[in-house]
C-alpha cells in the first residue's frame, strides 16, 4: 500500500479570511505567542514600545495601519533570534475620557461635573476607558498583532502614577518644574490650558474670522488716530497698549477725511487716495498715549500708551502698529510685564465677558465679534472690516475654538534643555528621514516650556503641596511620603484630602487642585510601566531606550515628543532609536474618512471579507511611510489578485504535482549548494538569495515598502518565469528520482519554504498555512524537530552557494532579448505558437542551456549570433518565412492549447487520461495527423479519433482560419 501524500491538497481558492480564522484557533490552542517568547527568552533584547491607545473609542482602519507596522518588526527581530517583549498598555487619563463621560451623563462643563460629584465622575471615567477594550483586543488579535494584553500597563494604576510623581520630583529638585503666569492656549469649554503639542494637533485650515482695522485716537492731537489691525475683535475690550517698531518709518496721512498714522511700508492697505502730511520714526511715537476704545473695566495703573516692540511688529501684514491685549497674547503679556503696563481680564474662564463689561457681559467672545465691530463703527473707531481665511487652533478633543488666555499654570522648563533635545533627536533614525530635521526638528527649534497643569479632574494629580500661610512648597515623589501606598487610589478627590505639615511655619499644606497633561503620562511609559525606580531597575535599564516605535505622523508633537522630552530631562538620552511615522488614511478618492461622507472602512468587516494579511500587505507595499494611504476594498483586493493569488497558485501547483509524484523533500536534501543543478534552477536559487539579501537589508533600516516590493518581484519571477519554464519537467512521466525532475522539485520546494519564512512577519497567517503544509505538519508527516509554526523558525539567510550575481544578470539579459524577439513577432503579426526557422542575436552568445530557453520562448528552431558592441544595445532579428512544415506545427500547437482548456473546463485531474475527438479538414487535419504523437503527449490523450462524438466538453471555431471542432471524453 502506497504511503499517503506528504502534502495536503490545496484548494484553488486562497480564501484568506477563512484560513486566518483557522490559524488563529490553532495559535490559541497551542499557546503559540507565549511559546515564541519562551523560545527567544535568552536572546539579545530588542525593545519595542507600544504607544498606548485610549480604549473609550472603537478602533478604526488608521489603527490597523499603525498596528500592522508595530507587529512587523518585532516578528522579524524575533525570527532573527532576539528576545522581543511586547507589553500592551492603555492611555486612560485626560480630556478625551472626561468628555466621553460628560456626553454619557448629558452634562457639560466643570460646574455640572462638580455638582454631580468628582468622585462619582472619576469612577465613571475609570469605567469608560475600559468600555471598548474587548473591541480593541479583538481587532488586535484578528490582525495578528502579537501583544501581551493579559498584563498591560494602565496610566491610572497607582504604581504608574507613583513613577510619574517620582519623575516630577526629580524635575522639581533641578528647578525644572515651576509655576508661572503666562498666556497659554486655553479651551473655554473644558476650562483648562493646553500644551503647545496639544495646540498643534487641533489646527483647522481655512477658518473664516473677522479682519478689522481700528482707529486709536491719540491724546493731545487733533483727531489723529493710530491705525491697528486684528483678527480677534473680542480682544479689543482688553486692549492696554499698542506697539510699534522703533526704527521703522511711520507716516501721518489724510485719507477719506481722516488723519491716520501707520507704517510707510503698509500704505497699501489704505482705501482710496491718501496724502502724506508728516513722517516720523517709530521711536518718536513711543510713550504717546491714546484714548481707550472702551471705558468699561478700565485697568488700574499704566495703560493706553505706545510701546516699543520690534519683536512684535511685522511689515508683512497689518499696519505696522500692533494692538496689544496683555491677557490674550503671549508676546503681549511679556511686553506689558516688561514695560510695567497693567494686565487685566475682561473675559472669564468660561470664555464669556465678565459682569463689569456692561455691553457684552455673558456673551461668548466669538459670538461678541459682530457686535463689537458694529459698536466700533457706530463710534467712528472702525476704519474698515472684512474677513480673513487662515489656520486657527481648536481644542484637540472638544473642537471648541481656543483662546489665548493669561493664567497661572505649572510648567516644565523644557527650553533649558533645548539643545540637548535637538542633539538627541538627531541621533534617531526616522522613517521618513525628513521628519528628523523637518517636522520634529522644526518643532524643537521653536520649543517653549511645557504647560503641564490642567484644571481638570481625571488625571495624574500634580504632586505639589503649598502652605497658604507662608507659601512654602513641597513636591512629593512617592506615595509613601503621604503615608499611602501605590495600591491606594491616588486620584482626585481622595488625594485632595491629604494634608501635610508645613516644616517652615507649622501650617497645613494642601495640594494644588490641578492634574497633569495626559501626554506626560504617555511619555512616562518607558519607566512607569515598570514602576521604576521603586522596583524593576534592571529591567528598565535593559528596556530603555526602545529600538523601535511607530505611530501616526501627528505624534511628532504628541507621544514622540513627550517620550523624547521626558527621557532627555530624566535620563539624558533619547527614548527611542528608530521611528516609523505613518501618514493619513484616506478613501480611494483622497478624502478624509467621516460618517458624513459614508466612506469609513470597518476593520472587522474588511478582515472578514478580504483577510487581515491582504490588508497588512497593502499598507506595507502601497506607499512609503509618511505618505498618505488611499484605502478601499478594491485596492486591497488588488493586492490579492496581484500578489497573493500569484503566490498561492505557485504553491498549489507544487503541491498538486508533489502529491502525484510522491515527492518527499527530506529524501532529496533540498537547499544547500546549487551545485550541478540545471542553470534555470541555479538562477532561481540565485534570485532567491538576492531577494533574501535585499529584504533583510530593507528591514534592517525599517523600509517595509522596499522589502515587500522585492518579495513581489521575486514571486512574479518564480511564477511567471521559473515555474512556467519548468512545467514540462514536472509534467513528464519520469519518476521523481529522475535527476532533472528531482532538481525542479527541490528548487521549487526550497523557494516556497523560504518564502513562507520570508513573508511571515508581513503575512503571519498565510505564511503559517504554507509552512505547516510544506513542513508536513498538516498531514502528520513532519520530520522530528521541525517547528510546528513558521513563527518558531529562523528568518531566512541566503546560502553562499546560492549566490550567483553573474547568472542573475545573464538571465535578465536573456529575458530582455526574449522581449525584443516577441516585439519582432508582434510587428510581423506572428503569434508565438507559430514556429519560426531562426532567430539571430546581435550580441554575445548565450550558454547552451540559456540558448535553449531563448529558442523555446521565441519558438524558433535555431539561434545564430552576430557580434555586437555591448549588452545595452543588443537586439534580435527573426526569419519570418513560414514553410509548410512550420505552418502545420503551428496549427497543432493551437489545437493543443484548446484541448488543455477543455481539460480544465471538465475539471479533470492532472493525470487523468482522455480520448480526443477532432473534426477538421485540409491542412488542420493534416497537422493533427502529422504531429499525432506529440499532440497526444501534450494533452494526455490515449487516442485521437476523427469525427464528432458524445463528450464531456467541446469547442468549435477556427484555427489558422480553418473550421474545427474538438471534444474530450474519458
Spans of features found by a protein language model:
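Metal-dependent nuclease catalytic cores in nucleic-acid-processing enzymes
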Residues: 68-85, 330-341, 373-376, 556-572, ...
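Amphipathic alpha-helical
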Residues: 24, 172-200, 204, 270-271, ...
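N-terminal, positively charged nucleic-acid-binding surface of large information/translation enzymes
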Residues: 2-256, 325-338, 342-357, 381-421, ...
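Feature 926 captures the class I aminoacyl-tRNA synthetase adenylation module centered on the KMSKS loop
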Residues: 213, 442-520, 524-526, 532-534, ...
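Phosphate/diphosphate-binding loops
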Residues: 367-392, 817-820
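Catalytic alpha/beta core of large soluble enzyme barrels
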Residues: 238-240, 244-348, 377, 418, ...
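Structured, non-catalytic alpha/beta "coupling" segments that mediate domain-domain communication
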Residues: 85, 237-289, 383-414, 640-666, ...
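Conserved short loop/turn motifs at secondary-structure junctions
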Residues: 12, 62, 89-90, 121-125, ...
Amino acid at each position: 500500500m502506497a504511503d499517503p501524500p506528504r502534502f495536503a491538497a490545496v484548494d484553488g481558492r486562497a480564501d484568506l479570511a477563512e484560513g486566518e480564522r483557522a490559524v488563529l484557533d490553532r495559535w490559541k490552542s497551542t499557546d503559540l505567542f507565549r511559546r515564541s517568547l519562551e523560545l527567544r527568552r535568552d536572546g539579545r533584547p530588542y525593545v519595542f514600545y507600544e504607544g498606548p491607545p485610549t480604549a473609550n473609542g472603537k478602533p478604526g482602519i488608521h489603527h490597523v495601519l499603525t498596528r500592522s507596522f508595530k507587529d512587523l518588526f518585532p516578528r522579524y527581530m524575533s525570527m532573527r533570534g532576539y528576545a522581543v517583549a511586547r507589553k500592551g498598555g492603555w492611555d486612560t487619563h485626560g480630556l478625551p475620557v472626561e468628555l466621553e463621560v460628560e456626553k454619557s451623563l448629558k452634562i457639560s462643563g466643570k460646574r455640572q461635573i462638580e455638582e454631580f460629584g468628582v468622585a462619582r465622575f472619576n469612577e465613571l471615567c475609570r469605567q469608560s476607558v475600559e468600555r471598548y477594550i474587548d473591541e480593541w483586543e479583538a481587532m488586535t488579535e484578528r490582525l495578528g498583532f502579537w501583544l501581551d494584553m493579559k498584563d498591560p500597563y494602565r496610566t491610572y494604576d497607582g504604581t504608574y502614577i507613583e513613577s510619574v510623581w517620582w519623575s516630577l520630583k526629580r524635575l522639581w529638585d533641578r528647578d525644572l518644574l515651576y509655576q508661572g503666569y503666562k498666556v497659554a492656549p486655553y479651551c473655554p469649554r473644558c476650562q483648562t490650558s493646553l500644551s503647545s503639542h496639544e495646540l498643534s494637533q487641533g489646527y483647522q485650515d481655512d477658518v473664516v474670522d473677522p479682519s478689522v482695522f481700528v482707529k486709536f485716537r491719540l491724546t493731545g492731537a487733533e483727531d489723529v488716530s493710530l491705525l491697528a489691525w486684528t483678527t480677534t475683535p473680542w480682544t479689543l475690550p482688553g486692549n492696554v497698549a499698542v506697539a510699534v517698531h522703533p526704527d521703522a518709518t511711520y507716516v501721518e496721512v489724510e485719507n477719506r477725511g481722516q488723519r491716520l498714522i501707520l507704517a510707510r511700508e503698509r500704505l497699501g492697505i489704505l482705501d482710496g487716495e491718501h496724502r502724506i502730511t508728516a513722517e516720523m520714526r517709530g521711536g518718536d511715537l513711543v510713550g504717546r498715549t491714546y484714548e481707550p476704545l472702551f471705558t468699561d473695566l478700565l485697568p488700574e495703573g499704566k495703560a493706553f500708551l505706545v510701546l516699543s516692540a520690534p519683536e512684535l511688529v511685522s511689515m508683512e501684514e497689518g499696519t505696522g502698529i500692533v494692538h496689544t491685549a496683555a491677557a490674550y497674547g503671549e508676546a503681549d503679556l511679556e511686553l506689558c510685564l516688561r514695560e510695567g503696563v497693567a494686565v487685566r481680564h475682561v473675559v472669564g474662564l468660561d470664555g464669556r465677558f465678565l459682569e463689569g463689561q456692561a455691553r457684552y457681559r455673558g456673551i461668548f467672545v466669538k459670538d461678541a465679534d459682530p457686535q463689537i465691530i458694529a459698536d466700533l463703527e457706530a463710534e467712528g473707531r472702525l476704519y474698515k472690516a472684512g474677513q480673513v481665511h487662515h489656520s486657527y487652533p481648536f481644542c484637540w478633543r472638544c473642537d471648541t475654538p481656543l483662546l489665548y488666555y493669561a493664567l497661572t499654570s505649572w510648567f516644565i522648563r523644557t527650553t533649558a534643555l533645548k539643545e540637548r533635545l535637538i542633539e538627541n533627536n538627531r541621533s534617531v533614525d526616522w522613517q521618513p528621514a525628513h521628519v528628523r530635521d523637518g517636522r520634529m526638528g522644526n518643532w524643537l527649534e521653536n520649543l517653549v516650556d511645557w504647560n503641564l497643569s490642567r484644571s481638570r479632574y481625571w488625571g495624574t494629580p500634580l504632586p505639589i503641596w503649598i502652605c497658604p500661610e507662608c507659601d512654602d512648597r513641597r513636591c512629593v515623589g512617592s506615595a509613601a511620603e503621604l503615608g499611602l501606598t501605590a495600591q491606594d487610589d491616588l486620584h482626585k478627590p481622595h488625594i485632595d484630602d491629604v494634608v501635610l505639615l508645613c516644616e517652615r511655619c507649622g501650617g497645613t499644606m494642601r495640594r494644588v487642585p490641578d492634574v497633569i497633561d495626559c501626554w506626560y503620562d504617555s511619555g512616562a511609559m518607558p519607566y512607569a510601566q515598570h514602576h521604576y525606580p521603586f522596583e524593576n531597575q534592571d529591567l528598565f535599564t535593559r528596556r530603555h531606550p526602545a529600538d523601535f516605535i511607530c505611530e501616526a505622523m501627528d505624534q511628532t508633537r504628541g507621544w514622540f515628543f513627550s517620550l523624547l522630552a521626558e527621557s532627555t530631562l530624566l535620563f539624558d538620552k533619547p527614548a527611542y532609536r528608530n521611528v516609523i511615522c505613518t501618514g493619513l488614511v484616506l478613501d480611494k478618492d483622497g478624502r478624509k474618512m467621516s460618517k458624513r461622507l459614508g466612506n469609513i472602512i470597518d476593520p472587522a468587516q474588511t478582515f472578514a471579507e478580504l483577510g487581515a494579511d491582504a490588508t497588512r500587505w497593502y499598507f506595507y507595499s502601497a506607499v512609503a511611510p509618511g505618505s498618505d494611504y488611499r484605502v478601499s476594498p478594491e485596492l486591497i483586493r488588488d493586492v490579492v489578485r496581484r500578489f497573493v493569488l500569484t503566490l498561492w497558485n505557485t504553491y498549489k501547483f507544487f503541491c498538486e504535482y508533489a502529491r502525484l509524484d510522491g515527492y518527499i523533500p527530506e529524501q532529496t536534501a533540498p537547499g544547500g549548494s546549487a551545485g550541478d543543478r540545471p542553470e534555470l534552477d541555479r538562477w532561481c536559487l540565485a534570485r532567491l538569495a538576492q531577494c533574501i539579501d535585499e529584504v533583510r537589508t530593507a528591514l534592517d533600516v525599517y523600509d517595509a515598502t522596499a522589502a515587500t516590493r522585492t518579495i513581489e518581484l521575486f514571486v512574479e519571477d518564480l511564477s511567471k518565469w521559473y515555474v512556467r519554464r519548468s512545467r514540462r519537467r514536472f509534467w513528464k512521466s519520469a519518476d521523481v528520482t529522475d535527476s532533472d525532475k528531482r532538481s525542479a522539485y527541490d528548487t521549487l520546494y526550497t523557494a516556497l519554504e523560504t518564502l513562507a519564512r520570508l513573508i511571515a512577519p508581513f503575512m503571519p497567517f498565510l505564511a503559517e498555512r504554507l509552512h505547516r503544509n510544506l513542513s508536513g505538519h498538516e498531514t502528520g508527516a513532519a520530520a522530528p524537530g521541525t517547528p510546528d509554526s513558521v513563527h518558531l523558525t529562523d528568518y531566512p539567510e541566503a546560502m553562499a552557494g546560492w549566490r550567483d550575481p553573474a547568472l542573475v544578470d545573464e538571465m535578465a539579459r536573456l529575458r530582455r532579448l526574449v522581449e525584443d524577439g516577441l516585439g519582432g513577432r508582434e510587428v510581423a503579426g506572428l503569434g508565438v505558437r507559430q514556429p519560426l526557422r531562426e532567430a539571430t542575436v546581435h550580441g554575445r552568445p548565450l550558454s547552451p542551456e540559456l540558448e535553449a530557453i531563448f529558442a523555446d520562448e521565441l519558438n524558433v528552431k535555431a539561434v545564430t549570433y552576430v557580434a555586437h558592441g555591448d549588452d545595452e544595445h543588443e537586439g534580435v532579428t527573426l526569419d519570418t518565412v513560414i514553410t509548410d512544415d512550420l505552418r502545420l506545427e503551428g496549427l497543432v500547437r493551437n489545437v493543443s492549447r484548446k484541448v488543455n482548456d477543455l481539460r480544465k473546463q471538465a475539471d479533470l485531474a492532472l493525470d487523468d487520461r482522455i480520448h480526443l475527438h477532432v473534426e477538421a479538414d485540409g491542412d488542420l487535419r493534416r497537422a493533427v495527423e502529422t504531429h499525432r504523437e506529440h499532440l497526444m503527449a501534450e494533452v494526455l490523450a490515449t487516442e485521437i479519433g476523427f469525427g464528432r462524438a458524445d463528450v464531456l466538453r467541446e469547442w468549435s471555431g477556427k484555427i489558422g482560419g480553418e473550421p474545427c471542432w474538438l471534444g474530450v471524453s474519458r
